[in-house]
Design a protein with these regions (language model features):
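AMP-dependent adenylate-forming
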Residues: 32-56, 178-179
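Short hydrophobic alpha-helices that are characteristic scaffold elements of the AMP-binding
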Residues: 96-102, 123-124, 262, 271-274
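Conserved AMP-binding/adenylate-forming core of the ANL superfamily
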Residues: 45-97, 114-119, 184-193, 206-207, ...
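Conserved AMP-binding
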Residues: 86-89, 110, 248, 258-262
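Structural core segment of the AMP-binding/adenylate-forming
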Residues: 102-191
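Conserved AMP-binding/adenylation subdomain of ANL enzymes
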Residues: 236-253, 261-274
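Conserved pre-ATP/AMP-binding loop-to-beta segment of ANL
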Residues: 41-44, 164-168, 172-179, 183-217, ...
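Conserved S/T- and glycine-rich ATP-binding loop of Class I adenylate-forming
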Residues: 82, 99, 212, 218-221, ...
Length: 274
């Protein structure tokens, strides 16, 4: 006779009544960032211990504004789809909040993707700007991007014309290396100096908390991956309520050891800290 497995039934007493509408905040991610940059300017927000990088809320907010103006300079605006194909590098979050402030949609790309998967996602998402790093493990992201966009090596930066990817106009290398046809991070920040603060403020004022801010693709287990549209309201409150139930306070520190491209990293980890 086969013994029955010793399963223990766990009952979760989830009180829906406690989640009334007054607990859900109607703020954009940009507004959340500016709230903490104003109220706790000198408190640390992000620490990269392996790179000896530390940002307070006010320092990070300034870098986000500079990055946002750089994105505006290359044609990114409300509704533009910006992809990030990178592991947890420092400017991953900078680019997320920069997109959020100007109403662009941040498309997260799995770092395990190979050529066909990358091309499918870029085409399906109508991606306008792709941000990349050198690669992960045995994958060369730079070479794979050139394979996908053969026109890139021979075009002026910001003037990409791809027959297969008509929406794609820019590729940004997240770092200081220079690659043909691509901007690097420093060049984007430099271009932002030509954008007036009033233009940034204008775009910020048009963003609603109910706008889509993040597009995450499903794993594709039962078919082609599908882009899931997530709003500012959705992910900010998701992170807030999760943090509330874990009893997080402003004195706690959260170690994010999961990929930021996944919902666990970008929502449950990052948004908890808001």
């Amino acid at each position: 006779m086969t013994a029955k497995p010793n399963f223990r039934l766990i009952t979760l007493n989830f009180q829906l009544s406690t989640f009334n509408s007054t607990m859900l905040y109607e703020r954009t991610l940009g507004q959340w960032l500016e709230h903490w940059a104003t109220n706790t300017p000198d408190k640390e927000y992000i620490v990269y211990s392996d790179r000896n990088l530390r940002f307070t809320w006010s320092q990070f907010n300034r870098r986000v504004d500079d990055m946002a103006k750089g994105l505006i300079a290359i044609g990114v605006e409300r509704g533009t789809h910006v992809g990030i194909w990178a592991a947890n590098v420092p400017d991953w979050l900078t680019l997320l909040y920069a997109c959020a402030k100007i109403g662009a949609v941040y498309v997260t790309v799995n770092t395990n993707y190979k050529q066909a998967e990358l091309e499918y996602l870029c085409e399906n998402s109508d991606m306008h700007t792709l941000c990349i790093v050198n690669g992960e493990k045995d994958s060369d992201f730079v070479q794979m991007t050139y394979t996908m966009l053969p026109e890139l090596k021979n075009c002026q930066r910001g003037h990409l014309k791809s027959e297969r990817f008509p929406y794609m106009k820019n590729v940004i290398y997240v770092g200081q290396e220079k690659h043909r046809g691509m901007y690097n991070t420093s060049e984007i920040l430099l271009l932002g100096n030509n954008v007036e603060d009033t233009r940034l403020d204008e775009l910020k004022s048009q963003v609603s908390c109910h706008d889509v801010v993040n597009m995450q693709y499903t794993s594709g287990t039962t078919g082609f991956p599908k882009g899931v549209m997530l709003t500012h309201y959705n992910i900010a409150n998701n992170g807030f309520l999760t943090g509330e139930h874990m009893k997080f306070t402003s004195d706690d520190k959260l170690c994010c050891c999961v990929p930021l491209f996944h919902c666990f990293g970008v929502v449950l980890a990052t948004m908890n800290c808001l």
